[in-house]
Regions:
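Conserved phosphate-donor/acceptor-positioning beta-strand/loop module used by diverse small-molecule
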Residues: 83-88, 97-121, 157-158
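Switch/connector loops and helix/strand junctions flanking conserved nucleotide-binding motifs
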Residues: 25-27, 93-95, 112-118, 163-167
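Post-Walker A helix-loop "phosphate-sensing" segment adjacent to the P-loop in P-loop NTPases
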Residues: 8-17, 177
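Glycine-rich phosphate-binding P-loop
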Residues: 1-5
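Conserved AAA+ ATPase "sensor/coupling" helix adjacent to the nucleotide-binding pocket
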Residues: 52-56, 118-126, 170-174
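Short glycine-/polar-rich loops that comprise or flank the Walker A/P-loop
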Residues: 12-13, 98-103, 149-153
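ATP-dependent small-molecule kinase phosphotransfer cores
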Residues: 20-83
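Small-molecule kinase domains that catalyze NTP-dependent phosphoryl transfer to phosphate-bearing small molecules
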Residues: 127-174, 178-199
Length: 199
């Protein structure tokens, strides 16, 4: 989220705010806001949107619906801005199927300890974190393994925030130049995956 928020300070980019049926959370001490962090909707609204084909992609993740609406992408297009979003690998797979020229970036921490520290900040209490840990752990393994296997992800190690922001922006604006130029990052990510598996 930090990298995306920095990119969104530029008028070139527009955030594609996803819809979700989960309740707002507190991340790093700040409550999520409707229309900014997500469009928080109930299950019936999600079902209606699905039936009316109002989502570009929608998936069930951890028992919750997450989706990107056609309306959100249309806003970016109408404003002639680069659409950016933060979605899971299932959503990216759908984007790649619908628009193969989409640019997919997988940002990972430098090690498992940093990953756990950052993940804990997403929860209000240690108890909340521990309750979600089994799902998050399994999901991290699945998603990172998948991202390392498919050819369309650019992998970035977020060990230096300013560098990670700069590289992310360069890839978004000049993606073809960077195709498969991330072997070192992929090696770090592969080691991270092995560490996470062994937690």
């Amino acid at each position: 989220d930090t990298i995306k928020k920095q990119l969104l300070k530029s008028p070139e980019f527009r955030d594609i705010v996803s819809h979700t049926t989960r309740a707002p959370r507190t991340n790093n001490g700040c409550a999520e806001q409707d229309g900014i962090d997500y469009h928080f909707i109930d299950s019936q609204t999600a079902e209606n949107m699905l039936q009316n084909n109002e989502f570009i992609e929608a998936k069930f993740v951890h028992g919750t619906v997450y989706g990107t609406s056609v309306a959100e992408l249309k806003l970016a297009h109408d404003q002639n801005r680069v659409a950016i979003t933060d979605i899971d690998v299932q959503g990216v797979e759908e984007y790649e199927r619908l628009a193969p020229d989409s640019i997919a970036i997988f940002i990972v921490p430098p090690n498992s300890q940093t990953w756990i520290e950052r993940l804990k900040k997403r929860y209000a209490t240690e108890e909340d974190f521990q309750a979600e840990w089994p799902k998050r752990h399994a999901s991290a393994i699945k998603e990172l393994a998948y991202a390392l296997e498919v050819p369309y992800y650019h992998v970035i190690i977020n060990d230096d925030l300013e560098r990670a922001i700069r590289v992310t922006e360069e890839i978004i604006l000049r993606g073809d130049v960077f195709k498969r130029q991330d072997d070192e990052a992929r090696l770090v990510a592969r080691n991270l995956l092995n560490d996470i598996i062994n937690l």
